[in-house]
Each structure stands twice: as structure tokens, then as C-alpha cells.
Amino acid sequence: MGRHKKPETIYDIHEANDRLADVFRNHGFDLVSHSQRQQLAHFYRLLMLNQEKENFTRLLKLRDVAIKHFIDSIIIMKYTDLQFPLLDVGTGPGFPGIPLKIMYPDQQILLGEGVQRRVEFLKHVRSEMNLKNLDILGRNINKHCVYPVRGAITRAVEDIGNTLGNVMSCLEIGGRVYFMKGPGVGPEIEAAKKDWGEYYKLVQDVAYSLPQTPHERRLVVYEKIKNMPLPEEDEGEELLMDELSNEEKRRWAKY
């Protein structure tokens, strides 16, 4: 099989920006400004520069990435109000966290990812794009993690109930968990009600499609209503905030 062309021989950032504008316009998606499109174009270029080595996504064409990654990550802005600081659980190469960071430049977002090569890529993106108020947590988010946030979001395939348990210790009362799911999520919702109904209430369940496509989605949002005791640490587990700056640790000490 032939090798993919290097992305810099296909698009520069300005050309990618123009093509993104066409895609967003053709799909009736008008939430993104010129400067935000340029940042998304920069992110696309970084993804493609590292794609051959890392295989972050099976999507390579700009149009496909724009619809199935960029629009898919930020369309929830139409349907819900996000709470910050916001933790992206299992972000992979940065979805939905990086596009959301571009849309909310002044808000604090944390990217949780346990695969080291992805962590290094995320740090590279943060540096190359000069993204502020973006922390990268190089570990899996589980029940032993204590990173105080007001919201958690995930586009990962993990079961709703598992994620609710894993972020329990991170959320204050009233904190919200945003699940970006497919249309067949009903059984997960029923199981979560049975297992977690004492601690979370379902506050939103919105069915929608990506604009001008047949791709169906469900946004499922839970609000934390009750604390549960912190779990005992397993041997070898540490409750670390090692990726956060001392300033951030002090600022969040009030939570």
C-alpha cells in the first residue's frame, strides 16, 4: 500500500481554514469564528503530521475530520451549558477536549489520558498552539483520582455507570457529567439509574444528528446529588495531581 502524503504538502493552515469554512457552511454549522477555524486547522495539521507514526484516527480527509471529530466535539454547545473546570475523561488525541478548549479559551479544561504516546502528543499540541488553562493528566481517570472539577465529559466508549463511578471523587455536589453517546445508549441509562440513582440524577437526554448527515447521537447529562465515601487506595495507587502546576493546586485547594 502507498504511504499517505505528508499533510504539509496538501494543506497549509490558511488553506485548511478556508476548507473548514466551506464544510461548516455546507453543514449549517455557524458557531465557529475565523480565528477558531484557524486553530482547528492547526490542530488538524498536527494530527496528520503525527498520524502515520501514531495512528490516532482512521479519518484523514479534512472534511471527515471536520464533521466526525470537530463538529461532533463542539455541537453539544447547542444543547447544554458546560460547567468548568471541565475534565475530559479518556480524551485520546484530544477529543472533545481540544476543540472545546478552542471554543472556550478562557475556561479551565483538563485532559485525562493514560496512554503515554497520546499524552506526549497532547503536550506537543498545547505547546505548538499556545493553549492556556489546559492541564494534561497523564493517567487513567478512576475512582481513586481526586481532581476537583465542576464538570466531566467523555466521548469514549466506556459504560456510563463505570464513568460515573470513576469521576465521583472529582465532582462537587451539583457537578455534571456529560456523555456523548450513540443512539443505542438506552440500556446504559437504565443500568446507571439502578446502580447510581442514589448519587446522580439524569438531567438531560437529547437526541440529535450531526448536521446534514445520517449520524445519530445522544447527549446524556447527569448531575451529582450526593457524595459517597472516598474509596480506600489500592496498593500502589496514589492520589496525585502531578501534572498540575503548584499555582493550580493552590487555586483548587478550596474545593
Curated annotation (Swiss-Prot):
It comes from the Bacteria. Residues 233-255 are annotated as: Disordered. Gene3D superfamilies: Vaccinia Virus protein VP39 (3.40.50.150). Transmembrane segments: none annotated. InterPro entries: rRNA_ssu_MeTfrase_G, SAM-dependent_MTases_sf. The keyword S-adenosyl-L-methionine applies. It catalyses: guanosine(527) in 16S rRNA + S-adenosyl-L-methionine = N(7)-methylguanosine(527) in 16S rRNA + S-adenosyl-L-homocysteine. One of its GO terms (molecular function) is rRNA (guanine-N7-)-methyltransferase activity. It is found in: Cytoplasm. S-adenosyl-L-methionine binds at G90, F95, R155. Residues 246-255 have a biased composition (Basic and acidic residues). Keywords: Cytoplasm, Methyltransferase, rRNA processing, S-adenosyl-L-methionine, Transferase. GO terms for cellular component: cytosol. Its EC number is 2.1.1.170. SUPFAM superfamilies: S-adenosyl-L-methionine-dependent methyltransferases (SSF53335). Residues 233-245 have a biased composition (Acidic residues). PANTHER family: S-ADENOSYL-L-METHIONINE-DEPENDENT METHYLTRANSFERASES SUPERFAMILY PROTEIN. Specifically methylates the N7 position of guanine in position 527 of 16S rRNA. HAMAP family: 16SrRNA_methyltr_G. Belongs to the methyltransferase superfamily. RNA methyltransferase RsmG family. This is Ribosomal RNA small subunit methyltransferase G 2. The lineage of its organism: Bacteria, Pseudomonadati, Bdellovibrionota, Bdellovibrionia, Bdellovibrionales.
